[in-house]
Amino acid sequence: MTWERGFQRCWRVAIAMAALHGSASAQEPAPIDAARSAFLKGDYAASLAAAQKATPDDEDFPEFIALEIRTLVETGKYQEAVERVGELGRRAAFYPELALEAGRALRAAGHRDVASDLIERAVRFEAPRPAKDKSRATVAFGELLLEHRVDAKVVLDRLLEPAKKADPEGRAPYLALGKLALANHDRQLAAEYFREGLKRFPGDPDFNLGLEQSGLDLPAANREPGIASYLDLALKANPKHTAALLFKATELTGRKAFKEAKDVFEQVLAINPDHPEAWAGLAAIALVQDDEKEATAAIARAKKLHEDNPRVPEIIGTTLAGQYRFAEGIKYLEEARQLDPLSPPILFELGSNQLRFGQLDHGWENVALAHELDPYNVAAFNLITLRDKLRDYPVREKDGVRLRMSPEDMAVFGGRALELAARAKTTLADKYGIRLSVPVMVEILPKQEDFAIRTFGLPGGESFLGVCFGPLITMTSPRGRLGRSNWEAVLWHEMAHTITLDASRHRIPRWLSEGISVFEEREVHAGWGQGMTSEFRKRFLDGEVPPISRLDESFAGEDIMLGYYHSSLVAEYIVRTFGMEAMRAILADLSTGKPVDEAIAKHTKTANLEKDFLEYAKKIANSYGPDLDWTPLEDEEYVAYREDPAKWVAANPKRYAATMMLVSALTEERKWQDSKDLLEKIIAAEPNNRESFNPYMSLALACRGLGDEAGERAALLKLLSIDSNVSDAAARLLELGGTMSAAERAAHGDQMLQTNPFQEKAYRTLAAAAKESGDPRRTREALESLLALEPRDAGRLHYELATLLRKSDPVPARRQVLQALEENPRFQAALELLSTFPPAPPNK
């Protein structure tokens, strides 16, 4: 009997045996299942031994050979795997699972053409019909087609979904469907498949890894010491799970935990000493750390088996881009594209990073090609859809800044945004001594979803207001966040990132970049950026803050807000103590690859930076309400307070929490004078109070209740000088009457527009103040913004603008008076004004 005939006979026997001995199988796993189980647990020696022990008489012989080849590849025995494939000859293409593993082994060893030939021969066979006893074969055939770059939807509809339906308790369909969804950036769909698989195969490391890659958090009920994520569960089930270890190392690299990432990559190399992806990951870390010698050696090891392996430059490029080293990352991704010009993942990664780095034409071209080759890639589809929308968005330029906004937003506050962006760029570039070589593109997108897709490729990122990649800044329009944040402060913050990224050649650690940006916010306006609070005060005084060397870790956990403030204090300390020259020199050293701790030590000339900085920070913390007791009430204290709040506060006048609770009660009872008396005492103890339950807003309410308009205005102004995000305070200032100068009224209008640039009253206030001050340019800007909001008195405003422009700009003036008459054809004053213009020239 020939080998292949025996092979086919055994395949038929396997089906018959499964039918005849189903009950026995439930009691004792088949040998192939036991061997696969050993592989899943990371017992590769047992898996290999079982596979190599099999003979052609075994019912699952083809699957044993497939497992043997897979185990050899997993453990780095590439040459043995290739030799085993060579022994099979053309027979390797007869069975889908065997052909799949054989092709992957050949490709891993650098035999790409041979692998392609094998897969091409394998897919010529008829696809196994979806059936309970053939789900693995059906899925493997589908994966062969995907590797052959057959339309993913065809594979999904004709093989993978039918395989799942025919074998709902089978493992392979759920795993393949989840991986396909992940490849298409559809993490929600992927999670559904992996979750279904995990229900049927509890503890399976592949499904746990899939859920981690889908972005799911492990439910609290499933957590235990040492197990905080699905990734932890995967590695608990199989500590040698190469894919899980690579994912963990990549995540650690993204968080700049390079030492820990290296350790995990070394774990992979202990399993497979020649694993190209592990060596590529180590090469990327070396490049990020500017260790050219180590990077060169790691790249050589990564290419040891396969000089033209596109995954090596793809991994390096993706990692570098993830560290904001876009220029270098794009270079490696272009190398990957040259090695595999039709790879949708490579094209998409390259294109999306080119878009982030301001290389818009090339970026859109590569994303479009990725979408054309793989129309089911959700991220590519999202970007192409957004591109079509962005084409209709106008772009305005000034002083090296290009601003793109929706037509509606551009008409209302585009001029204001462009003016601010240009001023921020010029001011900060001069301050940090740099000259940008390319324009800065600022894109303010009207919908949060559009912002997320432009920035991350996928919806989400609700906590982000803006993101800077260097020459590109993306922001959400305040249209969707009215009154919830100061968009002007956000824009200034992001422009500071542009400057420090350029000054350091994108080598600045996140904590220092964020610290400088928050510090620069406060330099513009004390109410921008962050300041000391009772919570931050306690953390600094109790020593519950990380050392400067570990500040980056603050941005990956619950302490992110403290991380921003802490980092900004370090930046402030360096500038205040050693001058801007020191900060510029630190950034210059970073640009050469010098580690940040060495750069700071070199230019601060202090024996103990950490100690000196903490003294500086603690001095600021101690000065924040030093005579107040900021601690919340204990249970026993709260019980005593509830018995007689006024008496308890009188006996404990320094307890901030109790005082503010009493103020809240007095406000509800409209006991304005009692409330005001308490508030004035608490404010005197800390005039720059930044607590979330702020006494200045309560004081303004009390003054309003007492008819004290001057007191109310003073409280609101003080509050906004401390925290410019309080839009309610800005709105109330606009409502207040009284005698104010044009400059004061304009300041109130400007304050309102920082959080809500769509506020009609603010533009009316600015227009009136500018007119009174004799400033026609600002009058025109305010009136044009107001008209873009389509107010009810548009006719009168068009007339007012026409009157303003009549002598200086008669053509737009005539257009404005005509628009006034469109609103009201009987507008007598507009008719009279129109008569003063010469007739319009006839259309040519």
Segments predicted by a language model, with ranges:
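Residue-level recognition of tetratricopeptide repeat
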Residues: 36, 70, 104, 143, ...
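Juxtacatalytic substrate-recognition/specificity segment
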Residues: 83-84, 229, 236, 263, ...
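Helix-start (N-cap) detector for alpha-helical repeat units in TPR-like alpha-solenoids
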Residues: 28, 62-63, 96-97, 130-131, ...
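Structural marker of alpha-solenoid helical repeat scaffolds
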Residues: 57, 91, 125-129, 165-166, ...
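Beta/coil-rich, acidic/histidine-enriched accessory regions frequently appended to metallopeptidases
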Residues: 30-31, 36, 210, 274, ...
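Structural signature of tandem alpha-helical TPR/SEL1-like repeats
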Residues: 42-46, 75-84, 111-118, 148-159, ...
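Canonical positions in the second alpha-helix
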Residues: 53-54, 87-88, 122, 162-163, ...
